[in-house]
Amino acid sequence: MTKSELIEILARRQAHLKSDDVDLAVKSLLEMMGQALSDGDRIEIRGFGSFSLHYRPPRLGRNPKTGESVALPGKHVPHFKPGKELRERVSSVVPVDVADTAD
């Protein structure tokens, strides 16, 4: 689902709201979440999950074209941890083929 699809679905479900208002609300929510993460804050949405930053330490990478070793600096990356309710909903809906997950 894309952001545009989310806005469209929400606008249809909440017919009393203008599409522009739904658009503004979704964009504002995402902007606030991005700002909170960039400030180093953790975001927790009960029943859905939490967003936080994880630190990736410096490492030695490789240039895929030349094969040359490249020193990559450490960095913070966004991380999402699904909540228990979301994990249960997904596991009960999406069938897992054990043969596909085995190596």
From Swiss-Prot:
Alphabetized CDD domains for the sequence: IHF_B
A GO molecular-function annotation: DNA binding
Location of region: Disordered: 62-81
Gene3D superfamilies membership: IHF-like DNA-binding proteins
Assigned keywords, A-Z: DNA recombination, DNA-binding, Transcription, Transcription regulation, Translation regulation
GO cellular component labels: chromosome; cytosol
Disulphide-bonded residues: none
Record GO biological process: DNA recombination; regulation of DNA-templated transcription; regulation of translation
Subunit structure: Heterodimer of an alpha and a beta chain.
PANTHER family registered for this protein in UniProt: DNA-BINDING PROTEIN HU (PTHR33175), INTEGRATION HOST FACTOR SUBUNIT BETA (PTHR33175:SF5)
Family indicated by similarity: Belongs to the bacterial histone-like protein family.
Biological role stated in the UniProt entry: This protein is one of the two subunits of integration host factor, a specific DNA-binding protein that functions in genetic recombination as well as in transcriptional and translational control.
Identification of the protein by name: Integration host factor subunit beta
Organism field: Xanthomonas axonopodis pv. citri (strain 306)
Lineage: Bacteria, Pseudomonadati, Pseudomonadota, Gammaproteobacteria, Lysobacterales
